[in-house]
Amino acid sequence: MQLKRVAEAKLPTPWGDFLMVGFEELATGHDHVALVYGDISGQTPVLARVHSECLTGDALFSLRCDCGFQLEAALTHIAEEGRGILLYHRQEGRNIGLLNKIRAYALQDQGYDTVEANHQLGFAADERDFTLCADMFKLLGVDEVRLLTNNPKKVEILTEAGINIVERVPLIVGRNPNNEHYLDTKAAKMGHLLGK
């Protein structure tokens, strides 16, 4: 186990009241959070989203990506379902960090795509570690999920880490003229399933 569960509190939102559960990485002290809606116990697979931190999309309403749109849609789906989990995975910019993400944006402004920009900065296309999310699910007592994602690699990694993904639920929202090239690159170079 790479994490420990350290704190929890009620979080009222426009979608209803969630239980916010805080986790800490044992090796680094980095924190992550889960938003739990309703009763997630029992044998029925839980609707869940692993949402990687995106300050620009989630908090600053950037149209360069689909992250903020996906966050809102995931919370809506979970609330409509009556139960579910959103793991907020604190690995900004596919885990290159905020400042490097800004540098990658500058390279994209010069014509590089999102993958090429990461490579120019010395990073892989995706530096995230989703095994942390498997540990969060386990610490919440969940081992079967219906995963809201367009990323088959996320399904593969979570499955290898012991989480039974019984269904991949598409989450295709937020396409706009500012992020079309970004989304097309994620589909073509990273295998994301983003049918237009």
Curated annotation (Swiss-Prot):
Zn(2+) binds at residues 54, 65, 67. CDD domains: GTP_cyclohydro2. GO terms for cellular component: cytosol. Homodimer. Binds 1 zinc ion per subunit. Catalyzes the conversion of GTP to 2,5-diamino-6-ribosylamino-4(3H)-pyrimidinone 5'-phosphate (DARP), formate and pyrophosphate. GTP binds at residues 49-53, 70, 92-94, 114, 149, 154. This is GTP cyclohydrolase-2. Belongs to the GTP cyclohydrolase II family. Keywords: GTP-binding, Hydrolase, Metal-binding, Nucleotide-binding, Riboflavin biosynthesis, Zinc. Its cofactor is Zn(2+). It is an enzyme of class 3 (hydrolase). One of its GO terms (molecular function) is GTP cyclohydrolase II activity. PANTHER family: 3,4-DIHYDROXY-2-BUTANONE 4-PHOSPHATE SYNTHASE, GTP CYCLOHYDROLASE II-RELATED. The active site is at 126 (proton acceptor), 128 (nucleophile). Transmembrane segments: none annotated.
